[in-house]
């Protein structure tokens, strides 16, 4: 059992290392899409990008809209027992035009910069590559992975709350894939 787990871990690490440049290109593409909170067109463009990637690995996708945003629910079927909900967001706090004014770049220290790159676009792309790596390694020991990319996390909305409540009822486990804080700090509430 442990040997199989070690082989799986090594296969995932190898996949991630081999696809790092692709990851950076996809992060650049997503970061350079203006998708500020309340920008329905921008959040739709960002979630269409995510949907294309998720469809390529075998997921089904469903878009949900309100007057302010586009939300995406992607579902990847497995052969296991448990359903896992992953939640991230494609919206940012930046207004339309910020991506052109301050486009994605990687500095001399290999840090990525751009509107929303750290909250939460890097995570959005990391989840996609993580799922690709698991699939490439042959891992499907889950009933379903539901990947919800929220279009209104920064400002919150009734639509997002309803979607999370609905998907939570369908899931055995949930992981919020938002950005971490220094020294392993976590955000538990907003003031």
Short names for language-model regions:
Residues 1-7:
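Short, Lys/Arg-enriched N-terminal segments with co-localized hydrophobic residues
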Residues 9-117, 136-141:
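Acidic/His- and Gly-rich active-site-bordering loop/insert found
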Residues 120-190:
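Acidic/histidine-rich catalytic neighborhood of metal-dependent amide-processing enzymes
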